[in-house]
Structures are given as C-alpha cells and as structure tokens.
A protein has these predicted regions:
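Core dinuclear metal-dependent hydrolase active-site scaffold
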Residues: 8, 37-41, 47, 159-189
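Active-site environment of divalent metal-dependent phosphoester hydrolases
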Residues: 17, 56, 104-109, 179-181, ...
Length: 219
C-alpha cells in the first residue's frame, strides 16, 4: 500500500489580542496566528482537516464575518486560502473525498461549501452548539453562512472515529475551545504519529495558568 502523505496548507492568518489566550499578558500585546489546514493523501482518498477562511475575507472582512473581524483581524493577502494551496500541489476541491471539521468557527470551516463532493465530518456536540439559538451572537464565534450548506451534508460523529478503517486517521474529541472540537491522530509510516490539535493548543510555550482564557469554554 502506498504510504500516506501529509501536506500543511495555509487557510489564512489572523491577529488577536494576546490576553485571549494568556489572561495575564500585557493588554497592549497582540499575536499573529496562522490558520493551518492539513491534506492527508491516503490510499483510499484525499482527506482535508479544516478548510480555513473563506476567500472573500481578506477584501471584505466585515461583510463576511459581521463584526467578528474586530477581535480576530484577518491579515492574509487576497488569494491566501486552502483552495489556492491545494491547487498549488495539483489538487482541486472536487478531488477531496473527506473534510474533517475540527470545529465550526469561520477560520476553520470557511471554505466548506467548495468541497461539494466530499463527506463532511463534524462532532455531534459541535453541530448542536452551532445550531443553538445563542450561537447566532457574534461573541459565540459561529457564522451560519460558513457551515450551514445543503452540500456537502454534514455527517455527525461521536467518540473516537477511525476515518478510513485502518487506524491511520483517528478522530479524537478535544472539547474545551468549543463543546465539540476534534483533533486527528495521524499515523505516518516513516515519520510516526502526529496529533492535529487545531485550537486545543494555539501556540508554543503555553503553560498552566491561574485564569481560564476567554478562548476556552466549559464542555
């Protein structure tokens, strides 16, 4: 069987106040965060972990994010998105067989609608959270325009889920940042195991803290 390949692609870049992640940081400090999408080229098909920001965000952030851009400021240039990243390695949207949504914030599911032929997997608790009435507030972090599409239809999953049935891509519940956030444990033949943790860990150097960051929620 052909070894699985893993490609990291840019889904955008944002700037946020550092206190969102580290409560005791200086309030004047900000941090730049890459939005990472991951393509897994499995023998049974192409699997994409997260789809990043919508292509319209760099030029029209307010019309796309409806106020969310005030605290999650997009800083990537036009054309920096997962679609162009895929195209650069010879993969088009219709070549993707499975899309895994770590969670349904717009910097992680913004391009979902472009993958019309894919099976789209999301944790059942995450879908429930995004559909809740209170999720319509900007502060909740969900935008229906980015995740609620007739195609591809969402496939809710619960617990650990073996995506391809061979143990190479296993979805793991990682609640905290959102109620139904998931990571993916990826096992490569030559390089070993990797955990795609999404926003469960946003930057190196994070440490035990005295206060709960605003980016975490009780789950």
């Amino acid at each position: 069987m052909k070894p699985m390949a893993m490609h990291f692609l840019s889904g955008g870049r944002v700037r946020m106040r550092k206190t969102v992640y580290i409560p005791d940081a200086d309030r004047s400090e900000s941090i730049e965060l890459p939005v990472i999408c991951t393509l897994l080229r499995h023998a049974q098909g192409n699997v994409l972990f997260d789809t990043g920001c919508h292509p319209d965000v760099p030029e029209n952030p307010a019309s796309r994010w409806h106020g969310m851009e005030k605290f999650m400021i997009p800083i990537m240039p036009k054309g920096e998105n997962v679609l162009s990243g895929l195209s650069g390695i010879g993969v088009e949207a219709d070549d993707i067989d499975v899309v895994i949504c770590s969670h349904l914030h717009p910097d992680h599911c913004g391009c979902n609608a472009f993958f019309r032929k894919a099976t789209l997997m999301v944790h059942a608790r995450e879908l429930e959270a995004a559909q809740a009435p209170e999720a319509q507030a900007v502060a909740a972090g969900y935008l229906r325009a980015d995740w609620d599409h007739p195609a591809p239809a969402m496939t809710p999953v619960e617990g650990e889920t073996d995506v391809m049935g061979d143990g190479r891509i296993v979805l793991l519940p990682l609640p905290g940042h959102t109620p139904g956030m998931m990571g993916a444990l990826v096992r490569l033949e030559n390089s070993g195991a990797f955990l795609l943790a999404s926003d469960a860990l946003t930057r190196g150097g994070q440490r035990p803290i005295r206060q709960r960051p605003r980016c975490l929620r009780n789950s």
